[in-house]
Swiss-Prot record:
Involved pathway(s): Carbohydrate degradation; glycolysis; pyruvate from D-glyceraldehyde 3-phosphate: step 2/5
Protein name, entry field: Phosphoglycerate kinase
E.C. no: 2.7.2.3
Annotated source species: Borrelia hermsii (strain HS1 / DAH)
Keyword ATP-binding applies: yes
InterPro entries per record: Phosphoglycerate_kinase, Phosphoglycerate_kinase_N, Phosphoglycerate_kinase_sf
Any single GO CC term annotated in Swiss-Prot or TrEMBL for this entry: cytosol
Length: 392
């Protein structure tokens, strides 16, 4: 999809109303990970350099339409001031006379941050009146919050009815790389899809199947596919109601000549607990009473083998119970293999992104997506409301 970007407009002396995703983790009022704030810097710096008056807005947490200081963006304003090397004024609200006065007093290159837009329930209701009030803070609407692009909220979609709408650099980058995956990926194209449930990933699997040369299926959902193929899976996760769906998917993969890689060996445990003792099973079949928790060495070697020649790779979702250290090796190793691949590599989805960040590999990945649910819906082929309003 081709979107309008900030380079398509002259921002000199204009008020740029920028929707960012500053939904950062906080502990006792302190930011524990500022990745999302840093991701917005290129857009903010560019707008400043063009002489814009930059008005930033975001949500933080789930205040459920009520003013709750626990979810104030004050810590974000403080961190932004440090990163930008200038004072970022924190405004007491996101609409109203006090905000209007502060915005009208801005000079070119100034940056202010509006208070949490989710202090108003009308934000998530995509209320026209609220979007109109927000629009009074800007001349041009810039959406740089890909992480919320799948939500039709006042600040992600509704504003486009009242202001010219463009995408920031982060939005443009997400659209470019995820779009490339869906439209014309260079072959060989390898899709690695993990996660616990077939039900939550089947739409992505079906969307990527016709474009893939090889598809790796891992995580808890792999056991439903192994069951379809006649293997015993012990006490591993099984979605009985998705047996037919999985069977039909494997049949379609065969018809399309897509090589599907399922686990060839396993790391298992007797109980689904963090302190369970890992046991290795050198076979596709899992013994009775055992639960599949991670992929084994044979499976990892097979994945490494297909990634060596891959020209395009998309990885979404963990290959094992990544949150338990004893069962995180499969996901960690796949992160290494993807990082070593010489082709275009795109990683999206909470746990796969966490793995890449945990092992300091993000610099070696072509594109690490900032959107969890948004990335997933984009890869499913859905039209995202926050991107649709930016189309050329």
């Amino acid at each position: 999809m081709s979107i309008k970007t900030i380079k398509d407009f002259d921002f000199s002396g204009k008020r740029a109303l920028v929707r960012c995703d500053f939904n950062v983790p906080l502990r006792e009022g302190n930011i524990t990970d500022d990745t999302r704030i840093r991701a917005a810097l290129p857009t903010i710096e560019y707008l400043k350099s063009q002489g814009a008056r930059v008005v930033l807005m975001s949500h933080l947490g789930r205040p459920k339409g009520e003013r709750n200081l626990k979810y104030s963006l004050m810590p974000v304003a403080k961190r932004l001031s440090e990163l930008l090397g200038q004072d970022v004024k924190m405004l007491p609200d996101c609409i109203g006379d006090e905000v209007a006065t502060a915005v009208s007093n801005m000079k070119n290159g100034d940056v202010v941050l509006l208070e949490n837009i989710r202090f108003y329930r009308q934000e998530e209701e995509n209320c026209n009146d609220f979007a109109k009030k927000l629009s009074q803070n800007g001349d041009i609407f810039v959406n740089d919050a890909f992480g919320t692009a799948h939500r039709a909220h006042a600040s992600t979609a509704g504003l486009a009815a009242y202001l010219p709408a463009v995408g920031g650099f982060l939005m443009e980058k997400e659209d470019e790389f995820l779009g490339k995956i869906l439209k014309n990926p260079e072959s060989p194209f390898v899709s690695i899809i993990g996660g616990s449930k077939v039900s939550s990933k089947i739409a992505v699997l079906e969307s990527l199947l016709p474009k893939s040369n090889v598809m790796v299926i891992g995580g808890g959902m792999a056991y439903t596919f192994l069951k379809v193929e006649g293997h015993s899976i012990g006490k591993s996760l099984l979605e009985n109601e998705y047996i037919d769906v999985a069977a039909s998917f494997l049949k379609k993969a065969k018809e399309l000549d897509v090589k599907v890689i399922l686990p060839l060996d396993h790391i298992v445990a007797s109980e689904f607990k963090e302190d369970s003792i890992p046991e290795y099973v050198d076979a596709i079949d899992i013994p009775d009473g055992k639960i599949g928790m991670d992929i084994g060495e044979k499976t990892l070697r097979k994945i490494e083998e297909v990634l060596v020649s891959a020209k395009t790779v998309i990885w979404n979702g963990p290959l094992g119970v990544f949150e338990f250290d004893s069962f995180s090796k499969g996901t960690a190793k796949v992160a290494e293999y993807v990082a070593s691949c010489s082709g275009i590599t795109v990683v999206g989805g909470g746990d796969s992104v966490a793995a890449v960040n945990k092992f300091n590999l993000s610099e070696k990945i072509t594109h690490v997506s900032t959107g969890g649910g948004a990335s997933l819906e984009y890869l499913e082929g859905k039209i995202l409301p926050g991107i649709k309003v930016l189309e050329k």
